[in-house]
UniProtKB/Swiss-Prot annotation:
Origin organism lineage: Bacteria, Pseudomonadati, Elusimicrobiota, Endomicrobiia, Endomicrobiales
Protein name in the entry: Small ribosomal subunit protein bS21
Gene3D superfamilies tied to this protein: Ribosomal protein S8 (1.20.5.1150)
Keywords: Ribonucleoprotein, Ribosomal protein
Residue ranges crossing the lipid bilayer per the database entry: none
Family classification: Belongs to the bacterial ribosomal protein bS21 family.
Species this protein is from: Endomicrobium trichonymphae
Pfam family for this entry, one: Ribosomal_S21
Gene Ontology annotations of biological process type: translation
Amino acid sequence: MVSVKVREGESIEEAIRRFKRECERNGVMQEIKKREFYKTPSILKKEKLAETKRKIRRKMFKDSKWSK
């Protein structure tokens, strides 16, 4: 959980900016977006497999591009 204490002489706007920065660093928004909708284990497995295939394809493309 992210918490920010307002420092002495600090405006609320500055504290809010620090809070937003901390949320970004800790990946709070990414986690919220990830958990927004439930994905069944089979869908997660398919997505992971598709991502792996994409990475392999990219790597092969890069290798063939630079080997010429």
